[in-house]
Amino acid sequence: MIDSLSFTTMPVVLLVGLVLYQLLAFTYRLFFSPLAKFPGQKIAGMTHWYEFYHDVIRRGQYTFHIRDMHKKYGPILRINPYELHISDPSFYNEIYAVQNRRRDRWEWSTRPGGFGGSVGGTNPHELHRRRRAALNPFFSRANIRKLQHEIDQKAVQLVERLEKETDRVIKVNHAFAALTNDIVMQYSFGRDDNRAAHKDRAARALPMEMLSKISSVVAMFWQEKQSITEEVRQILNGTNKAYKERPNRTIYHGILESKLPPEEKELNRLAEEAQITIGAGTLATAWVMSVGMYHLLAPGSVSMLKTLREELQRAIPDPSEPIDLAALEKLPYLTGVVKECLRLGNGTTTRLQRIAPDETLIYTDPNTGKVWDIPPGTPVSLSSLHIHHDETIFADPESFRPERWIENPDLERYLLTFSKGSRQCLGIHLAYAEMYIVLARVFRLYGRKEEGPSKGPSDKLGNLELFETELRDTLCVADLVVPAVWEGSQGIRIKVTE
């Protein structure tokens, strides 16, 4: 009888216990938590289910909802039981500090990705610094300079492919992803899949629009993970000898020669590191260049492209010669184009939380003068997507205006595509090099019909025009870690004409 009663009442007891636990948790979070004093919607501070609803049920909408909450509650906001979000860019350097100020990642946000072995997914400050130190030399400005010939070769392959595809439709997000994937695979493993030169291989370079479907993302990255793990395994067991044929060391052969302890050179950790390197090095740069391609070919931007082409014609009188990256970086209009690509393309849209484990961060609301003490150990974030579209910083923020960077060089501090601080994106110099060289190669030789006679050498190979592509094909409508466009998008498509 007692056993039977216990068996039948146990579910009820567990349910009551769960309800009481949740009530106590809600009460603590609302009234006694160190974050209870901060502004925000009460339900957001009570439970993660509020964020879950906006990000999972509504598909990547919490970033946009946070922006709306800031309009109501002010520049500092509690967005879940443990995290604060700040919309004030002047506080950016406090959140993403440099030098010897410790900043950890928040394990709650990095654990679900399954990339804790990578530099980007490493939470503790000291472990992150150790892992990053092994990779820093490969991504330094000086070492990326040594890669410029390889990048230029890939850009030339892309131009040659455009010549072959005259009067055909090309998905430039595929074409750019093929190019960036070739480059990062070469630098990582010494292997060149030659995707940039072949239409049928380009679509396998992690196509961007697949990100509009979660199931496709899972399948895509699982397949890529198996391939990358095998690449790392071959490096570990010594069967990959491709690096011996390269003038520059590959990243993962170099890691094996580094001073990292043996446990940091195990297969699973290096495979996670490699997957992040390949994925980010392929998708992000390809997407921001694709966004730039749209804007340079969009209706009403004829004078913009003409200005760019005239600058490139002066800087590159003979396009058959190798391109000099240092010379390109000095071109003001090309630099403005690159930065507008980064601002409107974003690269990543997810919040990148930072924890100051041993500091109380002090934030002063510029509107009210109220001072907020942020307790040590609190995850704090700021969204680059919000800053890049802030009309108080970027006038007419939805417009692609390269001139803004020439008119106001101080805008540089608000360009947050690669984050900042001690955890800034490792690949920043590689991404910049790819963008400068590829955009210069393409638009030195291709223009558009409407631009009229050129002031420079008449060696144009042809014209580019958009094909059934609209502005909405470039706009971020959901935060899926990277920007996701509307579900019906066919990508950013162009047509090559004579």
Swiss-Prot record:
Intrachain S-S bonds: none
Cofactor(s), by name: heme
Pathway: Secondary metabolite biosynthesis; terpenoid biosynthesis
Record note on biotechnological use: Asperterpenoids A and B, but not the final product asperterpenoid C, exhibit potent inhibitory activity against Mycobacterium tuberculosis protein tyrosine phosphatase B with IC(50) values of 3 to 6 uM.
InterPro entries in UniProt: Cyt_P450 (IPR001128), Cyt_P450_CS (IPR017972), Cyt_P450_E_grp-IV (IPR002403), Cyt_P450_sf (IPR036396), Cytochrome_P450_monoxygenase (IPR050121)
Stretches assigned to coiled coil: none
Domain of life: Eukaryota
GO molecular function: heme binding; iron ion binding; monooxygenase activity; oxidoreductase activity, acting on paired donors, with incorporation or reduction of molecular oxygen
Family as reported in the entry's similarity comment: Belongs to the cytochrome P450 family.
Family matches, as PANTHER family: CYTOCHROME P450, N-ACETYLTRYPTOPHAN 6-HYDROXYLASE IVOC-RELATED
Protein name: Cytochrome P450 monooxygenase astB
